[in-house]
UniProtKB/Swiss-Prot annotation:
Its EC number is 3.1.26.5. GO terms for molecular function: 3'-tRNA processing endoribonuclease activity; ribonuclease P activity; tRNA binding. InterPro entries: Ribosomal_Su5_D2-typ_SF, Ribsml_uS5_D2-typ_fold_subgr, RNase_P, RNase_P_CS. This is Ribonuclease P protein component. SUPFAM superfamilies: Ribosomal protein S5 domain 2-like. It comes from the Bacteria. RNaseP catalyzes the removal of the 5'-leader sequence from pre-tRNA to produce the mature 5'-terminus. It can also cleave other RNA substrates such as 4.5S RNA. The protein component plays an auxiliary but essential role in vivo by binding to the 5'-leader sequence and broadening the substrate specificity of the ribozyme. Keywords: Endonuclease, Hydrolase, Nuclease, RNA-binding, tRNA processing. One of its GO terms (biological process) is tRNA 5'-leader removal. HAMAP family: RNase_P.
Amino acid sequence: MKKQYRIKQNEEFQYTFKKGHSFANRQLVIYYREKEDQCHFRIGLSVGKKIGNAVMRNRIKRCLRQSFHELEPDIKPAYDIVIIARNPTRNMNCGEIKKSLSHLLYKEGLLKNTRNKTSLR
């Protein structure tokens, strides 16, 4: 994934946590906030040490990055998205992680082919 699509700075993570919206399922927690001044989405990944050793954490991050790469054309631009992996992801393969991620993004209206969530309220 290109560097311009990544969130790396701690301040950006913290700002997304404080000012953004969140939603979750058993496997993933997603925080997001809209940034109208950017023309593409950016992602930040967090996999804690409770998940497993470095090999396990890196495998989960690779799966999440690959899932975003495959979903890239469908994700709405101008969002910062932070994903936190939970413990059940250690037993999932990449296909299951992608399915869980795409379901959450669809549910929250962050995919282009979904209706805006605010129009449902």
